[in-house]
Amino acid sequence: MPVLEFGAAALAAGPRLPAAGQLDVWMVRRAPLETAAELLDLTELSEAERRRTASFVRPTDGVTYASAHVALRRLLGAYLGLAPQDVPFVREPCPGCAEPHGRPAVAHPDPPLHFSLAHSHGMAVVALSRTVVGADVERLPRAETVEVCTPALHPGEQAELAALDDAGERRATFGRLWTRKEAYLKALGTGLSRDPGHDYLGADPHRRPAGWTLLDLPSGPRHNAAVAVRGGAPEQVTVRWVPPVALYAGQTVDLDAAGTVGVPVHRGAEGTTNGVSDWGA
């Protein structure tokens, strides 16, 4: 993908879908608060997205939400060869009741393009793949968050946390496993309506759910991020950082020139369906 074009230029460039076995992850930092109102291009958002942006009590949360959704629309538009405002979103059937309020999706792409969006405290993650994918990003948890939420975890995860004497290490470990858990539940389409204690997403990749690959992502010192991909480990995983200028009106940005990080994937014996990155458990 030499140049990622936005808007009308994306139409001329045509679709640029990921290859089979390829996982593309885009990390987005929110636009600077002092320039967001003037430069962030909200015209590409739906009316519902603009209302949601305006509904946040804290301006930083509204800018994070808007930055994430502008990035999502521009990225999907570039991959599909569409203007950002023309990307057709739908909801898949809920796994529990079959009503149309499940995982967000793009309507009828051929070949399929799956995506997942997550955002938290100034950072967003957009994951795109030809197979089902879920993504999550969270700010590093506070000690009280770990204490309150640990009883809801899988017994194996609770045991791993209990074995850690250092409070800082316990927070870091909880943060990594929780982002894996949310990424996996988003990929399932259930979110936290599924009991978070039902599935093991701890440090041992061989105990994680069969048929899925879980990857920790490099996300800086203040966040944890992870993706869950249906099936075996992707052949190629690439993480790119989107500069804030890419969210502004009238921009064409060569994102291959932005920070690009290849994510190493551990591949086990034939049939192994869990992968882990070199950034640890």
State the predicted function of each range.
Residues 1-281:
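Core catalytic alpha/beta fold that binds nucleotide/phospho-ligands
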